[in-house]
């Protein structure tokens, strides 16, 4: 970015944490973030099962963004009167033991954040949880396609349109740094349900 030069506006898209990426407070940079709505996603647990008492969170200890999502998920769960349990992994080889630990700890639901390691092995999670009727809430739509139950997910097409509109503003003379870095409002998120997963887990959604 420094080599880009400050005379050329830079517009980014789908950056989860622009501040951590060093993209904020620059007068030639703006764009959109794709931070998933963790609180809204966790709230889905009681939409599916109002009697759920304990939420587990499974994530990779190597991914800082996953820790951020874990903290947000726990914070929301507490406001819902749920207790929580967490398990971290370093590779897909750890997932089975980690999920079994959450099950043994009495979790009614498991939250999977947007996590690169977890995303490659969602089926490993649901192969255990489906037989037990445990709710699996996911951080993004792709994980639903791989076996997760439900998510509020970023609509990346809509996010791209929003980013493009920022580009138009810049082309029309607005300084990039004067355009607020933002993401999609909740109203434009997609509620994604995996009915096949619901049937496999004998869950009504």
Predicted region positions:
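Flexible loop/turn connectors
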Residues: 143-196
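Periplasmic-binding protein-like
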Residues: 11, 55-58, 107-118, 136-139
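Short, well-structured alpha-helical segments in soluble
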Residues: 96-106
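Hinge/beta->alpha junction and helix N-cap segments in small-molecule ligand-binding domains
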Residues: 32-39, 59-69, 86-97, 116, ...
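Flexible loop/hinge segments that line or gate small-molecule binding clefts
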Residues: 4-38, 139-150
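An alpha-beta-alpha
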Residues: 31-80, 180-197
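Hydrophobic alpha-helical segments within soluble ligand-binding/sensing domains
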Residues: 18-24, 30-53, 155-174
């Amino acid at each position: 970015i420094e080599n880009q030069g400050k005379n050329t506006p830079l517009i980014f898209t789908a950056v989860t944490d622009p501040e951590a990426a060093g993209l904020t407070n620059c007068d030639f940079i703006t764009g959109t973030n794709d931070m998933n709505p963790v609180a809204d996603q966790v709230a889905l647990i009681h939409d599916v099962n109002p009697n759920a008492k304990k939420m587990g969170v499974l994530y990779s200890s190597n991914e800082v963004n996953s820790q951020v999502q874990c903290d947000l998920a726990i914070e929301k769960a507490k406001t819902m009167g749920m207790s929580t349990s967490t398990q971290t992994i370093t590779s897909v080889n750890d997932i089975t033991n980690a999920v079994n630990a959450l099950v043994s700890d009495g979790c009614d639901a498991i939250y999977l954040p947007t996590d690169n390691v977890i995303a490659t092995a969602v089926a490993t999670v649901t192969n255990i949880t489906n037989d037990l009727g445990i709710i699996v809430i996911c951080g993004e739509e792709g994980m639903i396609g791989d076996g997760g139950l439900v998510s509020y997910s970023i609509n990346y097409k809509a996010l791209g349109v929003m980013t493009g509109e920022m580009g138009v503003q810049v082309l029309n003379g607005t300084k990039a740094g004067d355009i607020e870095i933002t993401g999609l409002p909740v109203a434009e998120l997609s509620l994604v349900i995996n009915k096949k997963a619901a049937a496999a887990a004998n869950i009504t959604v």
